[in-house]
Every structure is written in structure tokens, then in C-alpha cells.
């Protein structure tokens, strides 16, 4: 029996407030913006929020990063902006909570598998052992999975549907060999192609490889990372129309329900936000993330939740701009 609320690991301290609007990426502010959006849409009651988790100390980051980088970042040294974001002490403090949030969500999914565990965070999957990259400071998913493997002996798979390849796990394997046990080779999955073929790539991996690995005991938990920048109108992504983006969500959450039945118990599942930029309309990013959770509530938890997706067409200058925008709006103003 599944718990009917999404367990959410959110502490306001994981949000960058000061100077947040000067950054190109709004990821440091996204947790707060999403919580506010969910409340505005009357959906926040479906989320059980806890801030009862400890911030990470420097030693936690050393699981996947060099001492030099960790020390340099928290002191505001030369590599403190290698992530492409502005640095200040409050931002440095906030990443202690974002990384602790994803770890806490994954660990909770294992200890309380009836709860869908949610970390409203991003800014992890491009970081490398000796520096940040691509708006990512520390490789939180690599740190979390190594800690979970060391503490609980559990092995995970990441379904990374961000608009960009999640390199941090692969780039950390040589630096931290325990990661090869925590997330085996081939289980940091990033779909290829676009639209229907992108969707099919996800389905083939999940049904053809991941499912058998779970049933055989090779994989213990799954982390779902459905980045909004894999949407076609994100300026830093391109893979999926609204239809195929939401089809991925619908497939995943219905598959989790199917796996619960095959296992005879809840499959440990956690999720995080990952990318999404839309400098012209950030509500479109928040709406995509919300639609993903609506599919979770409907497909997995069997709740009758009403929500109409609000993805606006990106204004593009060139051939057929006006006609494309109008037809795109008709196609994508849909209830999910």
C-alpha cells in the first residue's frame, strides 16, 4: 500500500535568495518557486514536506570531490564559480542542504518504500571531482548513492531525462571506485533521440534492462530525474514536445505501479528536478515539473487530480513564427 502523499525533503535554507536573479540559471531558486507554484495551483496538500534532515559537512562532499575543490568552494576561492554561478556565503550554505536533500530522499525511499520521496533540487549532474560545471556545483547524486551503498548496501539506477547528458556519475567512477558498486555501469541512463524515439528509448531501457535487474535483485532503487530542459522550447534543450514529455512521465509512474505488483512490495523510488531554464517564461518550467507529479498522483497513487499544463510557446523570430506559435499553443494547452 502506497502512502498517498509525496514525501518532500525541503528546507528553505536550500534556496539561494541573495543575488539569485543575477544568475542565468534559476536552479538555485527553483525549490522555492516550485513549492509556491504547487500552492498556487492547490496541489501542495499532496506533498508531505519535511525539513528534518542534516546539512552536509565538508567530509560528505569528499566522497566524490577533491579536498582542494571542496575547501576552495566553501572559502569562495577561484573554483567557487566553476559552476557558472555567482558565489556568496549564503549560496555556499544552500548547497549543503540541496545535496543533503537528494541523499535524504534516496535513503528514505529505501527505508520507507511506500513513500514516493522527492528532493526539489537540481545542480548536480555536470559536476566533476575537481570542480563544478554547467550550473552544477557538487555531484549530489554520486555522493548520495555512494553513501547509501556504504550505509545500507543498496544499489541504484538513475533515469536522467534532463536535456543534457548527466556526466558526473561517469566522470566520478575513477575518482571514487565505490560508485561502480553503488550505481553499476549501464545504470546511469540518459535517453537519446527526440520525441517518439526518445520515449521509445526510455521504454526499451526500462522494460528491457532495468525491470529484469530489479526483479533479479541487481538494482534496489530507482531515481527519476525528469528535467524540464528536455522540452523542445527550452533554450538549452530540444528533445520532446509537450506530448512526448508528458508521455514519458505517464509511462514511468504507471511502470512503477506495475513493478509494485510484480515485486509484491513498493519499489523504492525517489525523484529530483534537474534542469529547466526558459528565461522567457519560467512558469512553463514549473508547469512541466508539476505535470510530472500529477502523473505520479494519478498513475501510481490512483488519485483523481485535475491539472491543466501551462507550457507557453517560446517566441522565436524567423520563418512561420506566428503560425507555429498559435498551432503549438493549441496542441499543448492540454489537461494532463
Question: What label would you give each PLM region?
Answer:
Residues 1-56:
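N-terminal low-complexity, Ser/Thr- and acidic-residue-enriched intrinsically disordered segments
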Residues 15-21, 55-59, 78-91:
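Glycine-/proline-rich flexible loop or hinge segments
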Residues 29, 33, 56, 65-68, ...:
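Generic alpha-helix structural propensity
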Residues 29, 52-56, 64-65, 197, ...:
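Short coil/turn linker and secondary-structure boundary residues
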